[in-house]
């Protein structure tokens, strides 16, 4: 059982992964859930080794000057690891995604059509830093009967090896073939993975804007994901200002490197003179660098915001602020500069909230709460493989439902199409069952 794929032809590796995934998909839901529990226990037993491996990655990252946003994603402490393990167990409690009947219809007596959910097959997941993504994605793949080829960034290599070794140990202890989860370890394998359009069914990139765009532009395999996380918080004229300050603090500082952290704050001009000084005091105490438009700078002393700031994902303790004339102006700004990820309004006006929720074009639109809630675990999805900002589903945080497709099953008793065509054609009953 090898953690890495370096000595193996990737096409052959993908074939082995698919075969193991087919075996996994054929298991009962109980068996797959037992495998997840075995993986969770194995990760707990290997916690010291995993955290030590991550410390090695973090030390090397510091020596090489890794960007702060990436370092934040790379660092894996005991709390984050425990949360990832809890996510594995929560996935085991979710409904089985395989074999669900989406449609059942009688075409004629004794001719029954069903549409049934089934695994996608083999996933290729490429991510920067984010070693906890190994745990999330592996759990969802096991539950949904998919195989996965994991390719982490070189900065997370030791962490990924330790995590996948523990996952393999858990699968083996449950009597399952660990080949359904494979780890690629060299940079050259990233491009090679993107070329496996006959062996890999879906690519899921997780990382920076430039990274995701690179993946999208270098593969013929369908890609699930988002390139940017430019999220906004709009504070309306009827907002509870104390509540708005707390939401802004959480949405910007709770995890600034997250793709659902806000990058721009929009404030209604009627409350800006009262609200902005409160906000600035709170955020600057937390070391947030503030940039503002001209109207903002007339109220609080901050650096000027350039046009490019409205289209920038900082992934850091930096926030751009703009004073807007009204709700319509806020919505127009968001629909112009937003990345269709997650947008929020703070207001006591239900009509304003309804307008915002209906007219803002994003995968997630929130009222009186932080954008940081846009997360598969917090949505009750168990975990997520990523967030999609595409218009076609799946959209938003993607959990199990995004890892299955469907097939049509038609069961008859010798029927042929000629019976239902021509001048004496027998009519279909088309009766939903």
From Swiss-Prot:
Entry EC number(s): 1.2.1.41
Reaction catalyzed: L-glutamate 5-semialdehyde + phosphate + NADP(+) = L-glutamyl 5-phosphate + NADPH + H(+)
The record's Gene3D superfamilies line, in alphabetical order, gives: Aldehyde Dehydrogenase, Chain A, domain 1 (3.40.605.10), Aldehyde Dehydrogenase, Chain A, domain 2 (3.40.309.10)
| PROSITE patterns listed in its UniProt record | PROA (PS01223)
Q: Where in the cell is it found?
A: Cytoplasm
**CDD domains, per database record:** ALDH_F18-19_ProA-GPR
One Gene Ontology CC term in the entry: cytoplasm
The pathway entry for this protein reads as: Amino-acid biosynthesis; L-proline biosynthesis; L-glutamate 5-semialdehyde from L-glutamate: step 2/2
**Which superkingdom?**
Bacteria
Q: Can you tell me which family this protein belongs to?
A: Belongs to the gamma-glutamyl phosphate reductase family.
- Recorded protein name is Gamma-glutamyl phosphate reductase
Which gene codes for it? proA
């Amino acid at each position: 059982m090898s953690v890495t794929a370096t000595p193996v032809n990737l096409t052959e590796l993908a074939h082995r992964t698919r075969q193991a995934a087919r075996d996994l998909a054929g298991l009962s839901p109980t068996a797959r859930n037992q495998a997840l529990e075995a993986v969770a226990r194995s990760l707990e037993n290997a916690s010291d080794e995993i955290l030590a491996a991550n410390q090695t990655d973090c030390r090397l990252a510091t020596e090489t000057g890794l960007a702060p946003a990436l370092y934040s994603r790379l660092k894996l402490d005991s709390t984050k690891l425990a949360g990832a393990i809890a996510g594995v167990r929560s996935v085991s409690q979710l409904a089985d995604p395989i074999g669900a009947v989406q449609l059942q219809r009688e075409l004629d007596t004794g001719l029954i059509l069903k549409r049934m959910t089934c695994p996608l097959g083999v996933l290729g997941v490429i991510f920067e830093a984010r070693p906890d993504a190994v745990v999330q994605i592996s759990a969802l793949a096991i539950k949904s009967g998919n195989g996965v080829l994991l390719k982490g960034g070189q900065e997370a290599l030791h962490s990924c090896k330790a995590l996948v070794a523990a996952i393999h140990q858990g699968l083996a202890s449950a009597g399952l073939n660990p080949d359904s989860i494979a780890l690629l370890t060299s940079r050259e394998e990233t491009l090679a993975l993107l070329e496996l359009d006959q062996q890999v069914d879906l690519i899921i990139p997780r990382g920076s804007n430039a990274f995701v765009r690179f993946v999208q532009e270098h593969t013929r395999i369908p890609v699930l994901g988002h390139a940017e996380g430019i999220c906004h918080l709009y504070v309306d004229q009827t907002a509870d200002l104390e509540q708005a300050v707390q939401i802004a603090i959480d949405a910007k500082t709770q995890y600034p490197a997250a793709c659902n952290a806000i990058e721009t704050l929009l404030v209604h001009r009627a409350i800006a003179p009262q609200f902005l000084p409160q906000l600035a005091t709170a955020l600057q105490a937390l070391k947030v660098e503030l940039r503002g438009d001209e109207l903002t700078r007339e109220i609080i002393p901050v650096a000027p915001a350039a046009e490019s700031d409205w289209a920038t994902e900082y992934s850091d303790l930096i926030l751009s602020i703009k004073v807007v004339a009204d709700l319509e102006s806020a919505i127009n700004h968001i629909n112009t500069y937003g990345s269709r990820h997650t947008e929020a309004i703070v207001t006591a006006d239900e009509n304003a909230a309804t307008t915002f929720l209906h007219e803002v074009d994003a995968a997630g639109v929130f009222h009186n709460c932080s954008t940081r809630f846009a997360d598969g675990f917090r949505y009750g999805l168990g975990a997520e493989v990523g967030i999609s900002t595409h218009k076609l589903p799946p959209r938003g945080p993607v959990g199990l439902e995004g890892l299955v497709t469907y097939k049509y099953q038609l069961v008859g008793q010798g029927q042929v199409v000629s019976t239902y065509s021509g001048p004496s054609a027998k009519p279909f009953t088309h009766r939903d069952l």
